[in-house]
Amino acid sequence: MKEDRIVFIFGPTAVGKSNILFHFPRNKAEIINVDSIQVYKEFNIASSKPGKSLMKHIKHHLVDFLEPEKEYTLGIFYEQALKIVKEIRQKKKIPIFVGGTAFYFKHLKDGFPSTPLVTSKIRIYVNNLLDLKGKSHLLKELKNVDPIRFNMLNKNDIYRIKRSLEVYYQTGIPISQFQKKQNSEFKNILIVGLKRSFEDLKTRISIRINEMLNSGLLSEIKGLFSKGYNENTPAFKGIGYNEFLLWKSRPWYSLNDIISLINKNSVLYAKRQMTFFAKMPDVLWFHPEDDLDDILNLIF
């Protein structure tokens, strides 16, 4: 039965994931957000949070609930997802995971990775390295000890950079070598991938950035700075936010410089997402507009 399964819908940034949700019947499904930045309060525009009209149309979970200074990890997400799926199924609805954080989707499908515990002594050591020598030193260290992990990570994701080094310093084994996983708690999964041509994506990314600016992104950034959020705030690791930190370290950067960098980073991120998702097995690929009827018939 369709009600017994779980649905994944993923694709690169700006592919049009949110738009298709307006066509989903609210009485048959609920959405579980799979985005590591949209979870944060106050970081609204550059994170492309679902708008009020979409949230009203169909219920969303794991959006706009976490304080910006809090870390959000795979482990927290996985535990929350388990609980929410049970709640949705009790309502006789279909749980639909929607987003672009590929790392989360991978472990929803394959199971939560088993990595060793790290002592407080090791954590303090890595934090001291960061304070004394900076992020660039940690990245250099990670590239030396675990190039596989280095190539996988967002270079602004300081939490996972530190975590990777902590595991290595604790065990002498790169975190990428810890392949043992529990069996996934999620069964009977339908995986829907959304795709467009890369040229189309680049155009849509540029349009989206202009829409963000017109929606007040600059005011939002200034407001976040005025509240004391900075480079140590986990929410600021997201594209569209992290670039504005350059205004503090490189005040000669113009707004156009920042916007160009956001565009460049967004395009590179979309490319990484496409590469990652293309390697996932059992994916049914669709164009979000041309194949909309096929998507709806498949899910519902």
UniProtKB/Swiss-Prot annotation:
Signal peptide: none annotated. PANTHER family: TRNA DIMETHYLALLYLTRANSFERASE. Keywords: ATP-binding, Magnesium, Nucleotide-binding, Transferase, tRNA processing. It catalyses: adenosine(37) in tRNA + dimethylallyl diphosphate = N(6)-dimethylallyladenosine(37) in tRNA + diphosphate. ATP binds at residues 11-18. The keyword Transferase applies. It comes from Borreliella afzelii (strain PKo) (Borrelia afzelii). This is tRNA dimethylallyltransferase. Substrate binds at residues 13-18. Its EC number is 2.5.1.75. The record marks 101, 123 as: Interaction with substrate tRNA.
